[in-house]
Design a protein with these regions (language model features):
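Surface-exposed, charge/polar-rich loops and edge strands
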Residues: 1-163
Length: 163
């Protein structure tokens, strides 16, 4: 399972510094000058905006006590940034957001954000354990939560229920 990165076409008319500053309420923020920021653990994100990379780490209190879906990185990003800050309430239908599979380089992600003056979010991949837990609970994954390589011809995953 690979990550499914997000590219936002614009930052809703905000100045880049104000947009970056809005992250401080929910994330530890560290500038990564000159380095693409690939998240290396759960609840961490790479943010690219205005030619700069930043490392974001979600504060534990924003996901503690949430159900399995609410603890996913894609849910945290949607609930704390895409929805309230950028006004993207439905990523499936909003034309301001697009997605890039984890098989692309972070350089490609940054270039896509630069094309429109928007922002890009490098995601940490959803784990197989998270995927199976949500499936076992009968819940649905948020849109564009995972990118699988190689692609399965059938498009199906089979999860053994018992031995």
């Amino acid at each position: 399972i690979l990550p499914y990165h997000r590219i936002v076409k614009d930052i809703k008319g905000m100045e880049p510094k104000a947009f970056i500053g809005s992250m401080k309420f929910n994330f530890e923020l560290m500038a990564m000058p000159g380095f693409p920021c690939k998240p290396v653990e759960k609840h961490c994100f790479g943010l690219y905006v205005d030619g700069e990379w930043f490392h974001l780490k979600a504060y534990p209190d924003i996901y503690a006590g949430k159900d399995s879906v609410g603890q996913l990185d894609v849910s945290i990003l949607q609930d704390k940034v895409l929805g309230p800050v950028l006004g993207i309430s439905d990523p499936r239908t909003d034309e301001r957001i697009r997605f890039m599979g984890g098989n692309h380089r972070l350089k490609d992600l940054a270039a896509a954000a630069d094309e429109t003056g928007g922002a890009a979010f490098a995601m940490y991949p959803t784990s197989m354990e998270e995927l199976m837990t949500i499936a076992d609970e009968g819940k649905l994954m948020p849109p564009k939560s995972t990118w699988f390589e190689p692609k399965l011809r059938s498009g199906l995953f089979i999860h053994k229920l018992s031995d």
